Amino acid sequence: MNRKQALIAAVATAIVSFSALAEARELIQNKGSDTLVNVAQAWAEAYQKVDSDVAVAVSGGGSGTGIAALINGTVDLANASRAMKQKEIDLAKSKGQNPIEHTVGFDALAVYLHQDNPADSLSIAQLAEVYGEEGETENWSQIGLEVPGCKGQEMVLVSRQNNSGTYAYFRKAVLGKRRDYKMGTRDMHGSKDVVDLVEKTPCAIGYSGLAYATDHVKLACISKDGSGECVMPSVETASDGSYPIARPLLMYTNGEPTGKIKEYLDWILSDEGQCIILKKGYAPVRDVTCN
């Protein structure tokens, strides 16, 4: 065998060995909520050091997308920032699936304002009039505010696309089950997109997960009815439930998890996994001590 043939043989052997190693690793498919995608990626990366025989492939697309993938049997774990709807559960069961819900953390669904907005607090009722169909509040002056740089004081309503769990949860918690969003909202693909648009738009108001907050936007203090004290969104107020728009963060499996999927979920709920969700700006499912 000459030198060239030996080199080709060595490369071929390396490729075969790498392929065999990749095939030996168990792949866990994880898809869904844009709110959870960053922490899900952090979990997946950290878990490589825990179990090198497992690879976790993470993608976003929204809670509805992840749930649909679970129903169709194309993922092992569906991330969601809302609970599955009954019609989704029924569809899953009709396809032989048995979705099981797992709470992996909590989030404060924050209301974002431009830095120059003078608003100190907003009530759930005010938000409903801002975002809800037939809501009468369309400009900042109607709630006694004048926002610098906002031409005509007309509100720019920043929302999420309707396959988003954040969209669904805000509708349920703020507008109520029987009320839809008013026309004219700017529906963003991702959580970060909401915050970015609010930062650049003096007239804007938007909602997104607390983990996407930056120093360039303002967080509104939210009250349940306008008469009581408002509560700021934080890890603590999401955890203790005092923030009016706190929500659980969920993962769904098809049936009770077993094997490597169970081991991965158990690790997510361990102190190590919960410290990662805390560092990403979400509330853990219980008190944890982190380095």
Question: Could you describe each region identified by the protein language model?
Answer:
Residues 1, 19-22:
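Glycine-centered signal
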Residues 1-9:
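Bacterial N-terminal signal peptides that target proteins for export
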Residues 9-18:
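Bacterial N-terminal signal peptides
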Residues 23-107, 112-291:
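Exported/periplasmic ABC-transporter solute-binding proteins
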